[in-house]
A protein has these predicted regions:
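N-terminal subdomain of lithium-sensitive/metallo-dependent phosphomonoesterases centered on the IMPase/IPPase/PAP
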Residues: 1-88
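Active-site/binding-pocket entry motifs
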Residues: 28, 73, 135, 161-162
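Short, solvent-exposed loop/turn motifs
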Residues: 113, 141-143
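An extended, acidic
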Residues: 143-198
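Residue-level signal for inorganic ion chemistry
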Residues: 22, 47, 58, 91, ...
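Short glycine/threonine-rich catalytic loop with a Thr-x-Gly-x-Asp
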Residues: 47, 94-95, 188, 192
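DPxDG-like acidic metal-binding loop motif
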Residues: 77-136
Length: 198
C-alpha cells in the first residue's frame, strides 16, 4: 500500500512551505501585544500570507483544480477536483500565543472528500488521511481506539462561537449536552487538531 499519493505529497509540500511563515509570525505575536495596529490585524495578515503560499503551491502542482479558501473564497470552479483550505485553524489560540493551531487542506473529488492533511507546525505533527488508505501521524499508521462504551471516552467539541447569531441557544445546548454525558469534554481551540486527536 502506497503511503502517500501524489496529491498528499502536494499538500504536504505546500503546508511545510507555508508553515515557515506561520512559525515566524507566531514568534512575533508577543511583540505585537503593545503595538498601535493591534494583534488582530497581524493575524489577518498572517492568515493571508499563509493562504497565498498554500494557493501558489497547490496551483503550481495542480493548475486545473479549483480552490475554496477561508479568506478569499472560491478560485476557478472545476467540478471535478477542489482544494479546501484553512490557513490557520485556531486563530484565537494563535492570536493569544497559545501553540495549538494548524494548517488544514482537504481535497474534494466530485463533492466527496478523498484526502486531507492537518499540520501542527509547532509540534511538527502531520496528520494525513486518504480514502482507502487509512490515516497516519508523521508516517505512522493511526488506529481507532478499542473503547466501545461512551463512558470510557473523551469528547472533543467546538462549542458555540462568540459571533454566532444563535449563540445563547447554542451555549444552552452545549451546557445541556455536557451535563448529560458526564464525560470529560475538551474544547482546545483548533477544531482540525481536536478531530485529529480523536
Amino acid at each position: 500500500m502506497k503511503l502517500n499519493s501524489a496529491n498528499i505529497n502536494v499538500m504536504v509540500k505546500a503546508c511545510r512551505k507555508a508553515s515557515k511563515v506561520l512559525i515566524r509570525d507566531f514568534g512575533e505575536i508577543e511583540k505585537l501585544q503593545v503595538s498601535l495596529k493591534g494583534p488582530g490585524d497581524f493575524v489577518t495578515a498572517s492568515d493571508k500570507r499563509v493562504e497565498k503560499i498554500l494557493i501558489e503551491e497547490l496551483q503550481k502542482a495542480r493548475p486545473d483544480y479549483s480552490i475554496l479558501s477561508e479568506e478569499i473564497g472560491e478560485i476557478n470552479n472545476d467540478k471535478s477536483f477542489r482544494w479546501i483550505i484553512d490557513p490557520i485553524d485556531g486563530t484565537a489560540n494563535f492570536l493569544h500565543g497559545i501553540p495549538h493551531f494548524a494548517i488544514s487542506i482537504g481535497l474534494e473529488k466530485e463533492k466527496e472528500i478523498i484526502c486531507g492533511i492537518i499540520y501542527d507546525p509547532i509540534k511538527d505533527e502531520m496528520f494525513v488521511a486518504e480514502k482507502g488508505n487509512g490515516s497516519y501521524l508523521n508516517n505512522q499508521r493511526m488506529r481507532v481506539s478499542s473503547r466501545k462504551k461512551l463512558k470510557d471516552c473523551i469528547i472533543f467539541t467546538g462549542g458555540p462561537r462568540n459571533n454566532s447569531k444563535n449563540r445563547e441557544l447554542s451555549l444552552k445546548e452545549y451546557v445541556n449536552f455536557s451535563s448529560k454525558v458526564l464525560l470529560p469534554v475538551r474544547k482546545l481551540g483548533s477544531a482540525a487538531l481536536d478531530m485529529a486527536y480523536v
